Amino acid sequence: MAASQTFPLGPTHEPASALMEPLPCTRSLAEGFLEEELRLNAELSQLQFPEPVGVIYNPVDYAWEPHRNYVTRYCQGPKEVLFLGMNPGPFGMAQTGVPFGEVNVVRDWLGVGGPVLTPPQEHPKRPVLGLECPQSEVSGARFWGFFRTLCGQPQVFFRHCFVHNLCPLLFLAPSGRNLTPAELPAKQREQLLSICDAALCRQVQLLGVRLVVGVGRLAEQRARRALAGLTPEVQVEGLLHPSPRSAQANKGWEAAARERLQELGLLPLLTDEGSARPT
């Protein structure tokens, strides 16, 4: 049996120190959000994961610079809508530090960059190449490609919205196969997601979010569970995941996403002309 895995924050840098440059009067919203992420990192670092987990990647750690760049650039004010993914993919956020972070979109549309370090443990079949990764993440290309077409400029999307993952960790089997949180042993899965749920509550309250859109069924379910009973109430809805493993998504995810956003009344928020607010 493989030894249980923990993931250190890493001796190569100290991301917390990067937050020690406060604004003259008070910390920014982005700094507060990053501090919450570092708090979550510290809590998750105490967990151990037995088989089937072989290696754990935490891109909020080793891809700290582009991740901080993303948050600092696009989380400057309150957000009405949070699009919530589940956890990083091996060719998206695991490479770039950005949720659904397909390399070309991150570099060419979001304009996010920065050095990506080598994880403390790196699986030979899943090397971390940062923005030099030659493989495109289909989910991320679909997700951000849709909003690029709809919004035109990133500033239009991020005026009211933000994108975040519930869990910052990527789990790999000894073979290098991606393991979703749903595939973890029940006890470890619940420990992990309970901590992430609590962090989500704090993050939603910090940003002033009124609507969480879970991208995929599991993200939606966890958000409903985590945010039940919050005051003021936070609405939770779902959006089909753009995964290539989804037959429904492969039939036309962009059309399905547009229809769903229309149902939720979000399209006006995502265009230059729109000034409506979600109900």
From Swiss-Prot:
Main location: nucleus
InterPro entries assigned to the protein according to its UniProt record, in alphabetical order: SMUG1, Uracil-DNA_glycosylase-like, Uracil-DNA_glycosylase-like_sf
EC number, as in UniProt: 3.2.2.-
Gene Ontology terms for molecular function: DNA N-glycosylase activity; oxidized base lesion DNA N-glycosylase activity; single-strand selective uracil DNA N-glycosylase activity; single-stranded DNA binding; uracil DNA N-glycosylase activity
Keyword Iron part of the UniProt annotation: no
One Pfam entry name: UDG
Keywords, sorted A to Z: DNA damage, DNA repair, DNA-binding, Hydrolase, Nucleus
Location of the region described as DNA-binding in the Swiss-Prot/TrEMBL record: 175-189
Broadest EC class assigned to this enzyme: hydrolase
CDD domains reported in the protein's UniProt record: UDG-F3_SMUG1-like
Cell compartment(s), UniProt: Nucleus
Entry GO CC: cytosol; fibrillar center; nucleolus; nucleoplasm
Residues annotated for substrate binding in this entry: 86, 100, 165, 241
Gene Ontology biological-process annotations: base-excision repair; DNA repair
Keyword DNA damage: yes
Function: Recognizes base lesions in the genome and initiates base excision DNA repair. Acts as a monofunctional DNA glycosylase specific for uracil (U) residues in DNA with a preference for single-stranded DNA substrates. The activity is greater toward mismatches (U/G) compared to matches (U/A). Excises uracil (U), 5-formyluracil (fU) and uracil derivatives bearing an oxidized group at C5 [5-hydroxyuracil (hoU) and 5-hydroxymethyluracil (hmU)] in ssDNA and dsDNA, but not analogous cytosine derivatives (5-hydroxycytosine and 5-formylcytosine), nor other oxidized bases.
Family: Belongs to the uracil-DNA glycosylase (UDG) superfamily. SMUG1 family.
Name of the molecule in the record: Single-strand selective monofunctional uracil DNA glycosylase
UniProt source species: Mus musculus
Source taxonomy: Eukaryota, Metazoa, Chordata, Craniata, Vertebrata
